[in-house]
Amino acid sequence: MKARLLILLCALSATDADTICIGYHANNSTDTVDTVLEKNVTVTHSVNLLEDSHNGKLCRLKGIAPLQLGKCNIAGWILGNPECESLLSNRSWSYIAETPNSENGICYPGDFADYEELREQLSSVSSFERFEIFPKESSWPKHNITRGVTVACSHAKKSSFYKNLLWLTEANGLYPSLSKSYVNDREKEVLVLWGVHHPSNIEDQRTLYRKENAYVSVVSSNYNRRFTPEIAERPKVRGQPGRMNYYWTLLEPGDKIIFEANGNLIAPWYAFALSRGPGSGIITSNASMDECDTKCQTPQGAINSSLPFQNIHPVTIGECPKYVRSTKLRMVTGLRNIPSIQSRGLFGAIAGFIEGGWTGMVDGWYGYHHQNEQGSGYAADQKSTQNAINGITNKVNSVIEKMNTQFTAVGKEFNKLEKRMENLNKKVDDGFLDIWTYNAELLVLLENERTLDFHDSNVKNLYEKVKNQLRNNAKEIGNGCFEFYHKCDNECMESVKNGTYDYPKYSEESKLNRAKIDGVKLESMGVYQILAIYSTVASSLVLLVSLGAISFWMCSNGSLQCRICI
């Protein structure tokens, strides 16, 4: 019996067998990603695809400064509002920045025809040449060119008028009919502006133009309109009971424009030869100008990013990421990050059979941990790690390249009477934006799922590689580990890792040790059976003796009466 118990104790005190385990990298990363099936999966490495930061400033775009209108809007700038005169010296810009509530626009009250279309045209212009289309001193010898000023357009507390237009009035009691033409010989589109004055009463009409019935005619190859003054009493705006309506047209190279009038003409003085640029645009922003450069400008501020998506603003100018409504777009490049819990061993659950990663393995994604008489240590499997890195890097670069179509996205212009069209356009834009956002999020979810499955597969493949080499020279003990039936020194361990393990060399030793272990198991089973029988008999005897003692005690004090009948 003593011999059997000694064998049992020897079997229970396990020997320090040589082992090798397959595992994967873990670290202290807190990055989380979403997949199709899971949310907030902690991973070792990931890349962000969504830019959400900006500098809050207006910057030069590719080294070219913007045209910052300040207190002026597009109308005030292009007509030449006296308060905007300083802007007329600008000849080129990267984009135009307008404030939301600019003060200086049309100074003499009236309507600007097709103003939203003009803004749209100017949004693609990156430079222009301002020139006298009809020189002031020589073009109107029979009309007064100095009296046409108004307090509504005052500057430095003096009455003034637009710097690109001339208000022609009677001279010496006459307003002769006029006819002026211009041929565009500049090989560029030319923007021509003019106006028509509508007095509030017939007396003003006679005083300014010496006739009650007047007209203005403007004709080109693509434009043909005749205007008549609308004389009517109106409420004063900026102290003026009269109105001026403003008009514009684009004159193609070689085209001719003809002005005819016998009164009420606000004549062109300066025109603009336009040069269009693909990266220009108009933004409405309260951001201030700063000494900075950027490739992408938004109304909120400049973005300096090579990421494919941004959630800062839908209006962008330059080479900009695509706007989406997402709050998180992070693509996994590493593995699930599940550092092993020491009380549960070295591993946790990846690949379905390993329960955690190794923070001690820092030079690769997948690898080995071995233990033998010479010590223990971690070693990465460089080949499988490098193949995985190359594959995932190529995939991430491909996704970014395909989705990173950088472009300018400017807002569309609608006037107050086009509210239904504006609302419809907003719904269409929102629909496209929802589709873009959905596509971006779905792409990231699918790729994250595939990447984690890819890592899972690589760990399994590494495990199978070791298993196929060792065959029955070692046994699987769970958690991705194998216990050798033979002594495996460092040279032996290295051969397992690099795939050159010599199975026949160790098979005889393994066979003998396997037989010994199996014998110990059988002997242990016999000992366990003897102990079980002994324990059962001893327990039964103790129970019977206890019952007898209790019965004797109860009979002696009368609590239990015993009758024996024959």
From Swiss-Prot:
Gene3D superfamilies, per the entry: 3.90.20.10, 3.90.209.20, Hemagglutinin Chain A, Domain 2 (2.10.77.10)
Mode of membrane association: Single-pass type I membrane protein
Residue ranges annotated as Cytoplasmic topological domain: 551-566
GO BP field: clathrin-dependent endocytosis of virus by host cell; fusion of virus membrane with host endosome membrane; fusion of virus membrane with host plasma membrane; viral budding from plasma membrane; virion attachment to host cell
Places the protein is found: Virion membrane; Host apical cell membrane
Transmembrane regions: 530-550
PTM note: Palmitoylated. In natural infection, inactive HA is matured into HA1 and HA2 outside the cell by one or more trypsin-like, arginine-specific endoprotease secreted by the bronchial epithelial cells. One identified protease that may be involved in this process is secreted in lungs by club cells.
Cystine crosslinks: 21-481, 59-292, 72-84, 107-153, 296-320, 488-492
Cleaved signal peptide residues: 1-17
Sugar attachment sites: 27-28, 40, 90, 144, 286, 304, 498
Subunit note: Homotrimer of disulfide-linked HA1-HA2. Interacts with human CACNA1C.
Protein known as: Hemagglutinin
Gene name of the record: HA
